Amino acid sequence: MAKSLFQKVWDAHTVRKLANGQTQLLIGTHLIHEVTSPQAFGMLRDLGLKVAFPQRTFATVDHIVPTDQVVEPYRDPLAQAMMDELRKNCAEFGITFFDRSTGKQGIVHIVGPEQGITQPGTTIACGDSHTSTHGAFGAIAFGIGTSQVRDVLATQTMALGPLKVRRIEVNGKLRPGVYAKDVILHIIRTLGVNGGTGFAYEYAGEVFDRFSMEERMTVCNMSIEGGARVGYVNPDDTTFTYLKGRPYAPKGAAWDEAVTRWRAVASDSGCRYDDVVKINAADIAPTVTWGINPGQGISINEQIPDPAKATDADEKANIEEALAYMKLQPGAPIKGTKINVAFLGSCTNGRLSDFQEVAKFVKGKRVAAGVKAIAVPGSQIVALQCEKLGLDKILSEAGFEWRAAGCSMCLAMNPDKLIGDQLCASSSNRNFKGRQGSPTGRTILMSPLMVAAAAVTGQVADAREVFGVSAN
């Protein structure tokens, strides 16, 4: 019987079916960070339990670390306390910790892949919403809560309800100036922020076949923003080339055996899906959000929605709420909206290729007067790669502040925060109310190059026009 990758991985990791309809799943890899793990370790101590398989758990610090300070003690005592607590917990329970002193620290969803910890055909859990990033490698990866972090630490298993599988095919060729971020924003806009509830998304088609691993990670990262618990791409030669030689990837004969196994985990031809969505790549334009969830998106040349044209009362109320918070006018073009801050980074777009693309076009240009622009690499390794290529200098000369690795302004748990009702052009993944540190701060999501275009013009702009983009 033909099976999807999701069904194969689910079946291979099923421990038992539970009476409540859930499945007890073996978790192949567990990733932790400083925010959702302290309470879980505390519960282990209270119960007198050990970590069942410490070799399957990997830790890093990312959410609260300051990006403008690397020397300890940190100015923020909470950041220092959380860093110290994670160090203590990892040492006590024998868990590998990618601390800042290792040169391998960074956002957990960037560290896992670059270390070769993220691999096809396994299950991956982490106490973070954007764990679906790892699905780019053909893994079933999902975010979990603190009590589930405890369960995985104690048993290497957790309970999860069944999911349906929706295949999303994007065929054709993307137009110049359209990036992976535009693809996922278009998908979420099309299917809605709740459209994926109860689903795993399988991304496929000619566009994904051509995408690099970093582009696939960008798309899978935001699956949860469309309601999907899981998002994945079938593993192929692009996957294997990326993984080969990385620290935790198999070596020698074990590598050949792994590739054979990984090829077999891909969805079978003729397997059944619960739903199939087909999208023409030519229909995707540079896309930005205008509202207060990632599904409230429009192409750069569209107008801000008018609640008077809503199809029902709920949609009308949602548009009105978003317009009031964002201080935007219905029917006005989104292009030309003034910005105060530009943020490059996050687990969505904080990888080497993101900074390479931006540096290529901002070289010789300057951030507009009155705009604060920061560039935050997703890991220490990404930072080092950028610095070896001189990308940090290009960005700094253009007026961006080059920072140390961390989550930074994506969720603003560290000092990188908006002030008042500042509007930020952001390459991150969420534009919720207050997401970037100020209860009245405003966020517009877009691709890294669109962030750069906004930074140098001081307003939401079409990067194709600003930089003369003719090819990706």
Curated annotation (Swiss-Prot):
Please indicate if the UniProt record lists 4Fe-4S as a keyword: yes
Q: Which reaction does it catalyse?
A: (2R,3S)-3-isopropylmalate = (2S)-2-isopropylmalate
Task: Tell me the Gene3D superfamilies matching this sequence.
Answer: Aconitase, domain 3
This protein's pathway reads:
Amino-acid biosynthesis; L-leucine biosynthesis; L-leucine from 3-methyl-2-oxobutanoate: step 2/4
What function does the entry list?
Answer: Catalyzes the isomerization between 2-isopropylmalate and 3-isopropylmalate, via the formation of 2-isopropylmaleate.
- The residues listed in the UniProt record as binding [4Fe-4S] cluster, with positions renumbered to this chain, are 347, 407, 410
Q: How is the cofactor bound?
A: Binds 1 [4Fe-4S] cluster per subunit.
- Give the protein family: Belongs to the aconitase/IPM isomerase family. LeuC type 1 subfamily.
Instruction: Tell me the leader sequence span.
Output: none
Where do the coiled-coil regions begin and end? none
Family annotation (PROSITE patterns): ACONITASE_2
Q: Which cofactor does it need?
A: [4Fe-4S] cluster
Q: Which HAMAP family match?
A: LeuC_type1
Keywords assigned by UniProt? 4Fe-4S, Amino-acid biosynthesis, Branched-chain amino acid biosynthesis, Iron, Iron-sulfur, Leucine biosynthesis, Lyase, Metal-binding
Protein name per Swiss-Prot or TrEMBL: 3-isopropylmalate dehydratase large subunit
Query: Might you name a Gene Ontology BP term for this protein?
Result: L-leucine biosynthetic process
The EC number(s) attached to this protein equal 4.2.1.33
Q: Which SUPFAM superfamilies match?
A: Aconitase iron-sulfur domain
Alphabetized GO MF terms: 3-isopropylmalate dehydratase activity; 4 iron, 4 sulfur cluster binding; metal ion binding
Record text on subunit structure and interactions: Heterodimer of LeuC and LeuD.
Could you tell me which InterPro entries the record lists for this protein?
Answer: 3-IsopropMal_deHydase_lsu, Acnase/IPM_dHydase_lsu_aba_1/3, Acoase/IPM_deHydtase_lsu_aba, Aconitase_4Fe-4S_BS, Aconitase_4Fe-4S_dom, IPM_dehydratase_rel_enz, IPMI_cat
Q: What organism is recorded for this protein?
A: Opitutus terrae (strain DSM 11246 / JCM 15787 / PB90-1)
